[in-house]
Amino acid sequence: MLKKILLTTFVSLLVSFNVQAAKYIFKKDLWTNCNILSDKDQSTLKNIDYQEEKKVKGWDRRKATANGWSENFFTAFIFFSTFENGQIITIRVNTEFKNKLEAKKQAMKYGKIYGQLPNFLRSNLNTITIHKGKRSWGGGNNDILIHTQAKDYSNKKVGDCVEEIMIHESAHVSLDWSWGGSLKKKPWMEAAKADGVFISRYAKRYKKREDVAETINWWIAVRCKPNSISKSDVKKIIEGIPNRLKYLDQQNFDTHPLKCNY
C-alpha cells in the first residue's frame, strides 16, 4: 500500500515537473483539441453578395521566397459579406477557382466560419483573402489569408481544425497590439511573467508574436465551451495560466454568438 502511495505521489510530481520544465501546457498546440467550435455552432453571417471581378493587391504565401515576402497583384472575385452586427467584410477569392459559382462556395464556407467567431474577434478585420495552395494561413494587416489546401489543418483524430485556425488568425488581427489589436502589451507581458508557463509549445517558441493567438482558443474553451474539451484540460488551463485568463476576463469582450461565463 505504501509503495502504491509513493508511486502515485512520484508520478504526480513527475507530471508537474515536466510541465514546469517544458514551460508549456500543450505539446500539440491548438491541434490538441479541434472541437472548440464546429459547424453546428451558430454563425452571424447574414448574406454574401457578389460585386465584381478585378485586380487587387494582397498576400499569397506561394509567392514567398528565401529573400522575403511582399504583396502582389492578382485577379479576384469580390464578395461583400454582411453580419448580424452590421459589419461588412470584403472576401476576395482568387480567380484560380474557375468561376463565380465556385468562388462563392469558398466565400460562403469561410464567411460562415468567420461568423461563428465571437464579435470581439471580428473587430479589426477588413478583408478575407482566399487562395488555393497548401501554404499556412495568416492574420494581420486587417486581413485573414486562407490557403484552402493547407495540409495540417484537418486532423482525423481530433476533428476538423479550420474553426480553431480561424480563431487563431483572427486573434492576430483583432487582439495583437502589433497589428493594432485591442490588447495592451505591458499588462499581457506582466500576466505571462506571473504565469511562468505558456499554453503551447508554439506559443513558447514564438512568444513575442504567437502567445496571444495561441492562448485565445483556450480562453474560449474554458469560458465559453468547457464541454468541448476534457475536464483535465480545463484544469490544466485554469491552473496553468490564471493571470492571462484574468486579463482576458477583464476585457469584458462582446462574445456573441457564444454564451460565456467568467
Describe every region a protein language model picked out.
Residues 160, 178-199:
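Post-HEXXH active-site segment of zinc metalloproteases
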Residues 44-145:
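Auxiliary, metal-adjacent structural segments of Zn-dependent hydrolase domains
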Residues 163-178, 213:
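Active-site recognition of the HExxH zinc-binding catalytic motif
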Residues 17-21:
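Sec/Tat signal peptide C-region and signal peptidase I cleavage site
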Residues 1-4:
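Positively charged n-region of N-terminal signal peptides that target proteins for export
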Residues 8-14:
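Bacterial N-terminal signal peptides
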Residues 148-166:
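Short pre-active-site segment immediately N-terminal to the catalytic Zn-binding motif
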Residues 190-262:
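Metalloprotease/metallohydrolase-associated module, dominated by Zn2+-dependent proteases
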